[in-house]
């Protein structure tokens, strides 16, 4: 699969031991903040995402800083939808806003690069909803399948992903792109953590 090969070749999928935002230790890390550096694969990913959300009724896109902003921006431009973004913490200067958008009365598509447990996404949903918006769906490039779908479901928000981590890792496990030791670590992680 071109997407997965590109992730490995461009060091956007790293193998090792990584601490995630959720606090979990993972044998792989998706560094999708740089995916937009590779136009062809990024453009293809955006096209696939648009195909998955074309029947969702929303009127504004909110990207989560920082990983979700490039993805949200491309989708916004291609679909002709207004765009805003949300930080996970105040910046401490200027207007000190967390949400950079007027979401009142709007149906929101929330966008990020990766979903793991759903902590950041659910926090963003709460903030947007408290400002008068209504998150109708959340879109990510990769769902790590570690609870985000269930967590967002508690808010009535559907999680849509372009790729599931299971398909990415299964491809890697059946390839010569990573070592046998790394394959074993990933298999062990899959058994313990993937829904």
From Swiss-Prot:
User: What broad class of enzyme is this?
Assistant: transferase
Query: What reaction gets catalysed by this protein?
Result: orotidine 5'-phosphate + diphosphate = orotate + 5-phospho-alpha-D-ribose 1-diphosphate
**Amino acids binding orotate:** 116, 144
> According to the UniProt entry, what is the EC number of this protein?
2.4.2.10
Residues annotated as binding 5-phospho-alpha-D-ribose 1-diphosphate are: 87, 91, 112-120
Q: Which UniProt keywords apply?
A: Glycosyltransferase, Magnesium, Pyrimidine biosynthesis, Transferase
Q: What does this protein do?
A: Catalyzes the transfer of a ribosyl phosphate group from 5-phosphoribose 1-diphosphate to orotate, leading to the formation of orotidine monophosphate (OMP).
Entry-linked NCBIfam families = pyrE
What is the similarity comment for this entry? Belongs to the purine/pyrimidine phosphoribosyltransferase family. PyrE subfamily.
Q: What is this protein called in UniProt?
A: Orotate phosphoribosyltransferase
Species, as recorded: Sulfurisphaera tokodaii (strain DSM 16993 / JCM 10545 / NBRC 100140 / 7)
Query: Which gene holds the coding sequence for this protein?
Result: pyrE
